[in-house]
């Protein structure tokens, strides 16, 4: 199986038709719509969040054929469709949002080309293995299998999932005392920097995330109403969180190098699912929510009070026996 002449000539096009007008166009293909509604709002945010798009086309044997690119204002149009002129046959499409932008934080391990196969496709976070203190550019993934018949353009939708997370950690003293972020070292560790074609993670060695921003903020008054509360915060940007990975959040007190907390991060995030989103699977929940906020409460000696935390504005009671 081959692509029509125009695709065989063009290795990187935003659409098949409209270029090489002297060549006979295909008479069939697909028109693809792209949707990102795999989120907690269940609303399509593709046009507001995806600023560049790459669509890889493979034949039914998994042989690479061509890459299509979409960029700029065309993606903001809710009527945007990507038109592909294809010969009759079965195809596998893999879409990446945010991968081909100038500010991308991810790239292909090897750029797909003629002779490459789908099973070898790999996407890796930049500077994997080094401490990451970057606000990662959002990355999205989607895939679709479909067939093309003679003389028809099939309409289809590629549904995307977001692979990047923003995690905000807040330290607050229970009695309302000031907490200074400079007194603590915040880290997240995981192994989540290398993606397979199906968006699953491939072990790539440990990854350390440091905050891309941190500081102090006054958030209100104490329960008595007589004092403002100054908290410390640290904000992380990470790759995909996967249930079963040994993802950990550690906070160390710099004065004596003692660990204030060392917790299995994903399990703590899933405490919120248990209480409020129990109908969702663990991985569905982690993939649907991409903006996290966790508040930990400290005593006067800056030790963690292990009774409850606040996750995304919900109070979650802690039972250590469950973790």
Q: Residue spans of the language-model regions?
A:
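C-terminal motif of bacterial Sec signal peptides marking the signal peptidase cleavage site
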Residues: 12-15
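A sequence/structural signal for flexible, mid-protein segments enriched
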Residues: 127-226
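Extracellular beta-sheet/turn segments enriched in Thr/Pro/Gly and aliphatic residues
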Residues: 118-162, 263-323
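Bacterial N-terminal signal peptides that target proteins for export
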Residues: 1-3
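Acidic/polar, low-complexity intrinsically disordered N-terminal segments immediately downstream
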Residues: 18-111, 273-323
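Short, low-hydrophobicity acidic/polar segments
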Residues: 67-162
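Tryptophan-paired
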Residues: 53-108, 180-275, 323
């Amino acid at each position: 199986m081959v692509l029509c002449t125009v695709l065989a000539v063009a290795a990187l096009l935003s659409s098949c038709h409209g270029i090489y007008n002297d060549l006979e166009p295909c008479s069939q293909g697909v028109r693809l719509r792209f949707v990102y509604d795999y989120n907690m709002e269940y609303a399509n945010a593709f046009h507001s969040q995806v600023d560049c798009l790459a669509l890889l086309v493979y034949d039914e044997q998994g042989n690479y054929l061509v890459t299509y690119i979409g960029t700029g204002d065309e993606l903001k149009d809710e009527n945007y469709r990507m038109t592909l002129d294809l010969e009759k046959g079965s195809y596998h499409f893999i879409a990446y949002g945010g991968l081909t932008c100038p500010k991308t934080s991810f790239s292909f391990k090897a750029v797909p080309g003629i002779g490459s196969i789908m099973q070898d496709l790999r996407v890796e976070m930049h500077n994997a293995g080094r401490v990451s203190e970057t606000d990662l550019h959002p990355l999205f993934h989607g895939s679709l299998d479909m067939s093309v018949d003679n003389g028809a353009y099939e309409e289809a939708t590629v549904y995307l999932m977001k692979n990047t997370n923003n995690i905000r950690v807040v330290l607050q003293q229970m009695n309302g005392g000031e907490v200074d972020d400079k007194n603590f070292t915040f880290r997240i560790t995981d192994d989540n920097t290398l993606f397979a074609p199906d968006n699953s993670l491939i072990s790539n060695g440990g990854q350390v995330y440091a905050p891309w921003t941190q500081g102090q903020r006054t958030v209100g008054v104490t329960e008595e109403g007589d004092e403002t509360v100054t908290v410390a915060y640290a904000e992380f940007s990470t790759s995909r969180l996967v249930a079963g990975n040994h993802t950990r959040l550690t906070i160390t007190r710099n004065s004596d190098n003692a660990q204030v907390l060392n917790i299995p991060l994903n399990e703590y995030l899933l405490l919120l699912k248990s209480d409020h989103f129990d109908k969702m699977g663990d991985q569905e929940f982690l993939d649907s929510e991409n903006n996290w906020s966790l508040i930990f409460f400290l005593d006067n000696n800056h030790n963690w009070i292990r009774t409850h935390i606040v996750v995304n504005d919900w109070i979650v009671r802690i039972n250590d026996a469950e973790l």
